[in-house]
Amino acid sequence: MCKAFCSCYSYHYHHREKMGIKEYYDKLAKSYDKLYKNKYMRIVEREIIQKEIKDGDFVLDIGCGTGEQLKILNNAVGLDISLEMAKIAKNKTNKPVVVANAEFLPFKNKSFDKAISFFGALNHCNLKRALREVNRVLKDDGIFIFTVANIYDIKWIIKNILKGNFKKVKNAMKKRKGTITKVIDGEKIKVKTRFYDFKEVEDALKKEGFEVVYTFGTNITNSPLDKFIYKSFLKNFASYIGFVAKKVKNR
């Protein structure tokens, strides 16, 4: 396992990491598991993991957070920009966790069979740069499974329209950007986030040396139904849009 690393695999910072994102998740870490309980989204994520990841695959979990997916992977390394998140993931899973930026992965070329990134990590970075780095560290024909926030999240759109937040919806649609706000121990914390659609991500994948195997959606209805419809046309209105992409050989 250690051959994959450019240097020591324990808590490793890159000099260009985005400090605002790091600080947000450092403060959020202790409350993260309580705030983000979505068992139906996790069920779909794990369904795909079990389908696509085989015994013996060496897996990189980008934006592993507190280790929810990392703990079910047999042979894996976690990566997160937040030291506090990484500490929790390390304690929860007893697996190696690297603290680093997804845009600058501290691993050697062609180190991993598969990579995953669910929920939040890729919403805060330069997606093309992150895809380029994932392509670099994956072996030929390696698979990258990931989700990003959907610009056409119907539940979010309806919720904000009903609240009268028309300007918020309009700005999000136009700029494809937004802000996540939480209150932790009486302190309001914020982080910028990005929204995507299927075509934008598919184009980026193609440009960075991937071919799309299939797409899916998570948190469509936030109910048991999601397990049966995550590949249907309803994925276009999910909270998160997902991709299973294969690295093109000799990239």
From Swiss-Prot:
GO molecular function, one term: methyltransferase activity
InterPro entries the UniProt entry points to: Methyltransf_11 (IPR013216), Methyltransf_Superfamily (IPR050508), SAM-dependent_MTases_sf (IPR029063)
SUPFAM superfamilies in the cross-refs: S-adenosyl-L-methionine-dependent methyltransferases (SSF53335)
Pfam families xrefs: Methyltransf_11
Similarity-based family: To M.jannaschii MJ0638 and MJ1123 and M.tuberculosis Rv2003c.
Signal peptide (residue range): none
Keywords from the named record: Methyltransferase, Transferase
Domain of life: Archaea
Record's keyword annotation contains Nuclease: no
Gene3D superfamilies: Vaccinia Virus protein VP39
Name of this protein: Uncharacterized protein MJ1252
Any GO BP annotation: methylation
